[in-house]
Structure formats: C-alpha cells, structure tokens
C-alpha cells in the first residue's frame, strides 16, 4: 500500500525517491491489505531497478522529468547550430549596414521619377524592411519621389511632404503580393466567425486596402475605375438594405454576375507615374479666351514670374492635353477614333507635350502651364499630369456679370457662355476638384495665398537633406545663362531687342497713363507673356527647343489656339478673337525670328474702360478687389507700384 501511494505521489529525483522509499518501508505496517494486492512479485519487480537506478513505477511516473533532464543535453544547440546562427546574424547585420549606407547615399541623388499612390500602406507591421523602422507609410493620393531601386521588393525614396525624410518604399511587386495575401486571408476569414474575419481583414486593411475604399469617386485619380466602383458599391447596398429577406437569395447571384464586369477595378495599379513636380494649371473664373478670365490669370502669371524668379518655369501649351488620357494612350484601338475626330491636336502632338512637361518637371522647378484648352478640372483628371488646379473664383455671379459687361459690347455679347462656364466651375466639389481656391477680394491677398501654397509645396519637394543642386538643373542653367551664346543671342537677345524698338514709339506716347497700373491685356498679349516666360525661365533647356517650334508656326496655326471650339462655344470664339488678333497684328511689326510681341494698347478702349470702371465700382460691395484684376486705374494700383516693380515691362524686356 505504501508503494502504491508513492507511485501516485508527485515525481521527484530518482535517488531521493529511493531513500524515501526505504524509510517508508521500514515504518510501514507489515500486514497491510493494500500491499497484499500487489504481491511480493510485484513489490520485488518494483524494487529491482534498472540500470538508471529507477523502478518501473518510477519510470512511468517520472518519465516527464527524466526526459526533461535528458533534454537538457539534447535541447542545447550544437556548435554547428551556434555557428550557423551567428553567421546568419552577421549576414543580417552586414546587409542592414549596406542598406543604411545606400540610404545615406541616395539622399544626395536626384529624383528619378515620381508616383501617385492609389493604395494606402502602413509600415507598422513590416518586419522585412532592409533597415528596421525606415519604411515609409502613405495614404492613397499621396505623392512619392523615388530616388532609386533597392531590390525587387523595395525602392528608396521619400513622401512628398514637408519634414519627411528618405526611406524605403514598397515596390509594386511587393504591394501586389501583399494584396494577394490579403485576399487569401479574407477568403479564409469567411469560414470563421464574423469577429475573427473582421480582425483579419482590418489588420491587413491598414496595409493595403483596395483603392476604391479610400478614393473618392470625384477625385482626379483614375476616374474610370472609381466611377465603376461607385456604381458597384451603390448597387449591392440597395439590394441589401431595402430588400426583404426573401430576396436575399437572389441578390448574391446578381452580384456575382456583376463581379466579372468590375473585376478590373480590383487590380488597379498601386502607383501612377506622374511628373516630379506637379504642374500648376489655372482655371476660372470663366472661359479662357475672354478678357475677364485672361486678365485675371495674366496678373497671377506676372506675380508668380517675379515671386519665384529662378525657381519657376511658365510654359505655354497649345495642344489639347485633355486628350492625354491614360485609357486613350494605352489603348491603340482608340487612337484611330481620336485621329478621325475634328480635334486640332493629334495624339503625337499631345504625347509630345506631355513628354515636354515631364521633362520640365525633372528639373524640380515649379512648372506653370498656360494651357489654352483647359477650363475645367475634369479635363485633366484622367491624365497622368496630376496637376495643381488653381481656381480663380468670383463668388458672386452678379459681380462676374458686371465685370464682363464692363469690358465692352464685344465681351457682353458672349455673356451667357461665360456665365455657364463659371457656373460649371462653381458646381465642382471644392476639396476634390481644386487644390487652391483664390476667392479673395484683393489681388495682393490672392497672390499671397497662391504664393504660400507654392512655397509650402517647394519645401515639400526640396527637403534640407537634398540641398545639393540638381545636375539636370545645373546643366540647363549653365546653358540658359550664357548671354553671348550665338543660339541664345539669336533666339532671345535679338528678339528682345526688336521688341524694345517695336514698342518704343507706342509706349512713349502712353507711358504716363499706362505705367502706374497693370493694364488689362487681351488674349494675344497674355500669350505673348507666356511665350516670353518660356524663353527666359531658368533651367528649361527643353523649353527653348520647344519655343523654336513655336517660332516656326504660322500665324494661322497660332490663331487656331484661340479659335479652337470649346464644346458649344466655337462660334463665339471665332467671332471675337479672329478680328481681334488680326487687328493687333496689323499694328505691330514682327521680329525676324517670328516671336510674338506685346500689342500696343488702344486709347479709345482705355477711355471706354474709364467710364465702365466708374459705373462698375459703384455697384460692387465686398468684391471691390476685382478691380485689381481688371480695371487697374488711378489709385487702385498705384500703391502697389513700388512692390510690383513694373511687372508689365519687366516681363517682356528683362533678360
């Protein structure tokens, strides 16, 4: 009985248990009935021990302990295992050191290209980053500057935000693998409870959710996909909520039938390649080609040219870049349709303009597009330009109407067309369609608002760690700043000299009344400024070659930039601008190389403008500042004269 009790007792060391058993045997009663049940044979069997000094009962009861003690030898890593682990650690540390060194070198390298993200990524759960803690997290619609490729899974770059440093960016291959893993876990989660399924999807949802969940339908990113997604998301919701349970059987089937149609939206590429510097495009307050819109944008162009001198490229774009949609350029079957349409811009010309814009952006200078055909943000939403849309807004339609009427009968004739265009812009969702909305009452306030945004964007794209000059920019600067270069002397210096002589007579007669103000200009004057901007911007060697192509154009091809039909406004443009441009060019002599010049102003126009200004100024309330965009007479702009620094004249004669 004693031995049976000891066999049930907690296991102890073999030697200690043997001594305790001998003591207990001597103290136990001799005739115990419980001990009889085992018999002497059993007791003898238990007492005779094996070679390890343990009885059979000890072996069964102490098997766990004894095996653990034996495992104290077998669980120890051998010398080969230790050396292998040390080798792995050394290799890991060396790879991490090399990755850190490559990361430091990449800080001074130029930006290879830029991408816009279509997905969201969180680096919190990543454990395979080349340098732990150096992965970059981003949201959908963010912009990334990529310096170089590290390996197949990681790029080296930075998030285009102020204060963000260089790090590791997951490559499209890695994001695609993560998306597949996420889908597999989501499918597995369907077989578990809703709680576990929700946890699995949410943990990976922070890393790479589908772009449609974080992409507003009206945003500028891949409208084709998001439009379909909005339709897909709305229809199942309507099937689920209002339908009774009896129809719940049919709604999944209808959804499954629709899924192949929407299958392409689930494979949206994680990145879209965009220009390294997002081009700035002005829209509003109404249609380009009319005086109210042109004079307001002209004032902003002049301000930007002086405010960001040496850091900005202002270029004119005559081609209809709204045709440069990704779905069109990537689908050869649609090329013939575009070519057969009555558009003045061929796809080859459009593609050339897009490449030129990308090339300008490589210098990491601010790029401003003076685009003739862009009057609405939706025109560029499907392109790869990812522009900064600046909306020059007149909040009150009555004020815009009075401004249009103040420009004379020729502008009031097309009042309805301009008001409809302004109304279309006002209906756009502001946060999703525009990056900057200039609705200030004062010209200087609007200019400072735009300047503050562009300064912040400049700091975001030029971190302190990459202050070294851009090699491409340095090369183009060295080319464009040689005043005695024969090419530049013929293209810019000589033409500017001709412009000075051509303008001397008309300017001397009206300089006293014109110089104290920023006179509103017509379309041809506005475009001449942009062409001169392109010729004199720093760091745009590609732009000079493009200017030469502009110079080779005939007058008819240039005029086509302004008489291009914009939807249903074609007859208004032809009626208004063909005689206008012919009249101005008859009064102006052209230089030998074909540069467009600034047309002389008409005094009769100015006198009528004085009267219109007096009437208009009485009717305006809080929108007094719009005078600074248009009727710049007398004291309205004279106090800005010292700050403006003769913008009009400097734009054309400054070398």
Curated annotation (Swiss-Prot):
Skewed-composition ranges (Low complexity): 193-205
- Enumerate composition-biased segments (Polar residues): 62-81
* Location of region: Disordered: 34-107, 186-257, 483-632
The entry's keywords: Calcium, Calcium channel, Calcium transport, Cell membrane, Ion channel, Ion transport, Membrane, Phosphoprotein, SH3 domain, Transport, Voltage-gated channel
| Annotated disulfide bonds | none
How would you describe the post-translational modification of this protein?
Regulated through phosphorylation at Thr-549 by CaMK2D.
Give the compositionally biased regions (Basic residues).
593-604
Q: Subunit composition? A: Component of a calcium channel complex consisting of a pore-forming alpha subunit (CACNA1S) and the ancillary subunits CACNB1 or CACNB2, CACNG1 and CACNA2D1. The channel complex contains alpha, beta, gamma and delta subunits in a 1:1:1:1 ratio, i.e. it contains either CACNB1 or CACNB2. Interacts with CACNA1C. Interacts with RRAD; interaction may be involved in beta-adrenergic regulation of heart rate and contractile force. Interaction with RRAD regulates the trafficking of CACNA1C to the cell membrane. Interacts with TMIGD2. Interacts with CAMK2D. Interacts with CBARP. Interacts with CAMK2A.
Q: Please give the organism.
A: Rattus norvegicus
Q: Which GO terms describe its molecular function?
A: actin filament binding; calcium channel regulator activity; high voltage-gated calcium channel activity; identical protein binding; phosphoprotein binding; protein domain specific binding; protein kinase binding; voltage-gated calcium channel activity
Record-annotated site: Required for CaMK2D-binding? 544
Query: Could you tell me which CDD domains the record lists for this protein?
Result: SH3_CACNB2
A GO cellular component annotation here is: L-type voltage-gated calcium channel complex
The membrane topology of this protein is:
Peripheral membrane protein
Q: What is this protein called?
A: Voltage-dependent L-type calcium channel subunit beta-2
Pfam families, A to Z: Guanylate_kin, VGCC_beta4Aa_N
Q: Which InterPro entries match?
A: CAB1-4_N_A-dom, CACNB2_SH3, GK/Ca_channel_bsu, P-loop_NTPase, SH3-like_dom_sf, SH3_domain, VDCC_L_b2su, VDCC_L_bsu
Q: State where the protein is found.
A: Cell membrane, Sarcolemma
What does the entry state regarding organ or tissue expression? Highly expressed in heart and brain, and at lower levels in lung.
Q: Which PROSITE patterns match?
A: SH3 (PS50002)
């Amino acid at each position: 009985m004693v031995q049976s009790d000891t066999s049930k007792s907690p296991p102890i060391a073999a030697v200690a248990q043997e001594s305790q058993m001998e003591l207990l045997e001597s103290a136990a009663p001799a005739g115990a009935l419980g001990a009889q049940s085992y018999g002497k044979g059993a007791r003898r069997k238990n007492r005779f021990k094996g070679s390890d000094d343990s009885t059979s009962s000890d072996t069964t009861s102490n098997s766990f302990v004894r095996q653990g003690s034996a495992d104290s030898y077998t669980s120890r890593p051998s010398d080969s295992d230790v050396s292998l682990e040390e080798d792995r650690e050394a290799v890991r540390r060396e790879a991490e050191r090399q990755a850190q060194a490559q990361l430091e070198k990449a800080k001074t390298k130029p930006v290879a290209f830029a991408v816009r993200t279509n997905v969201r990524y969180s680096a919190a759960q990543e454990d395979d980053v080349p340098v732990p803690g150096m992965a970059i997290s981003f949201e959908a619609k963010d912009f990334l500057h990529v310096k170089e490729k590290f390996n197949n899974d990681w790029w080296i770059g930075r998030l285009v935000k102020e204060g963000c440093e260089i790090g590791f960016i997951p490559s499209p291959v890695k994001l695609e693998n993560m998306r597949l893993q996420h889908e597999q876990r989501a499918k597995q989660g369907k077989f578990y409870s809703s709680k576990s399924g929700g946890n699995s999807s949410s943990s990976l949802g922070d890393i790479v959710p589908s772009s449609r969940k974080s992409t507003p339908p009206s945003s500028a990113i891949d409208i084709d996909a998001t439009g379909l997604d909005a339709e897909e998301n709305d229809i199942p919701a309507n099937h689920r909520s209002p339908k009774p349970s009896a129809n719940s059987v049919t709604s999944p089937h209808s959804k499954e039938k629709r899924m192949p149609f929407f299958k392409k939206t689930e494979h949206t590429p994680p990145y879209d390649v965009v220009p390294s510097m997002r081009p700035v495009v002005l829209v509003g307050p109404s249609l380009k080609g009319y005086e109210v819109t042109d004079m307001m944008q002209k004032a902003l162009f002049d301000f930007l040219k002086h405010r960001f001198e040496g850091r900005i490229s202002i270029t004119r774009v005559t081609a209809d870049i709204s045709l440069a949609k990704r779905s069109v350029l990537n689908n050869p079957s649609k090329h013939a349709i575009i070519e057969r349409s009555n558009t003045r811009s061929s796809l080859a010309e459009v593609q050339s303009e897009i490449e030129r814009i990308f090339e300008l952006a490589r210098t990491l200078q601010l790029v401003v597009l003076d685009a003739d055909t862009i009057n609405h943000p939706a025109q560029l939403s499907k392109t790869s330009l990812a522009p900064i849309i600046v909306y020059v807004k007149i909040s009150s339609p009555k004020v815009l109407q009075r401004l249009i009427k103040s420009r004379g009968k020729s502008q009031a004739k097309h009042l309805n067309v301009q008001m409809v265009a302004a109304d279309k812009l006002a209906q756009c969702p502001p946060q999703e369609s525009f990056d900057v909305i200039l609705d200030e009452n004062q010209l200087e306030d609007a200019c400072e608002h735009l300047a503050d945004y562009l300064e912040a964007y400049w700091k975001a794209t030029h971190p302190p760690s990459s202050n070294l000059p851009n090699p491409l920019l340095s090369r183009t600067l060295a080319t464009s700043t040689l005043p005695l270069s024969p090419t530049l002397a013929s293209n810019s210096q000589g033409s500017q000299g001709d412009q000075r002589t051509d303008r001397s007579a008309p300017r001397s007669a009206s300089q006293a009344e014109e110089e104290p103000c920023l006179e509103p200009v017509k379309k041809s004057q506005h475009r001449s400024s942009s062409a001169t901007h392109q010729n004199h911007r720093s760091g745009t060697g590609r732009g000079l070659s493009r200017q030469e192509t502009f110079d080779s154009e005939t007058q008819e091809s240039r005029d086509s930039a302004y008489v291009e039909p914009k939807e249903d406004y074609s007859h208004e443009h032809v009626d208004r601008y063909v005689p206008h441009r012919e009249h101005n060019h008859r009064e102006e002599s052209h230089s030998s190389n074909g540069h467009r010049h600034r047309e002389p102003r008409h005094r009769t126009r100015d006198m009528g403008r004085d009267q219109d200004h007096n009437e208009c100024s009485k009717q305006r309330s809080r929108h007094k500042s719009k005078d600074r965009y248009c009727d710049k007479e007398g004291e309205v702009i004279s106090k800005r004269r010292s700050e403006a620094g003769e913008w009009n004249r400097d734009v054309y004669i400054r070398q």
